[in-house]
């Protein structure tokens, strides 16, 4: 925009450096980010990465009187927790694949006795795009869920098992 004379990206990357000034900072260090926003006299913050959103950066900046665009911590749970998203869909009659949220192996095994394969296994929480597996055998489901329960994706030890749907994928967020 011609109304903007300077853009900063925290932390930025090689691509953003063509358009903006990259500032190396831990995106979860909200206090340091606030100091940098004030130092550079930034008028508006647009939050992109999921992790700071899930941890509440929008709430933190608003509390500190910073103009910010992005979902608050509660709304960010739609992206940050697959289990939360599925529960919201179920409670509001939003069409979604049939699912079961599990936090222990015996729940998984019980679900395997009543469902059809393949099954989609999703780590609840942020997993850098690596927390979803399409499992075609019960053995694969047990292996993937065990990895999650054992902390593979540190963000959660909960899994969402859901029926496999064919077709185009669509995201809510």
Predicted regions: what is each one?
Residues 1, 15-17, 69, 91-93, ...:
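Solvent-exposed alpha-helices and their adjacent loops that cap or buttress functional pockets
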Residues 22-29, 100-104, 135:
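Short acidic-hydrophobic, aromatic-tinged amphipathic segments that line or gate anion-handling sites
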Residues 36, 40, 110-111, 144:
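CheY-like receiver
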Residues 53-55, 108, 169-170:
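Short, well-ordered alpha-helical microsegments
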């Amino acid at each position: 925009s011609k109304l903007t004379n300077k853009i900063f990206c925290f932390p930025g990357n090689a691509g953003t450096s063509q358009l903006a000034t990259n500032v190396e900072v831990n995106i979860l260090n909200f206090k340091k980010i606030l100091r940098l926003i004030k130092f550079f006299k930034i008028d508006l913050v647009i939050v992109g990465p999921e992790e700071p959103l899930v941890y509440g950066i929008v709430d933190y900046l608003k509390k500190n009187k910073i103009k910010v665009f992005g979902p608050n911590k509660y709304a960010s749970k739609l992206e940050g927790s697959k289990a939360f998203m599925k529960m919201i869909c179920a409670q509001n009659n939003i069409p979604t694949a049939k699912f079961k949220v599990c936090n222990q192996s015996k729940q998984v095994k019980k679900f395997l006795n009543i469902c059809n394969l393949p099954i989609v296994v999703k780590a609840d929480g942020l997993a850098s795009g690596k927390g979803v597996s399409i499992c075609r055998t019960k053995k694969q489901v047990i292996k993937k869920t065990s990895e999650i329960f054992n902390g593979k994706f540190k963000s959660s030890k909960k899994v969402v098992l859901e029926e496999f749907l064919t077709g185009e994928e669509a995201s809510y967020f």
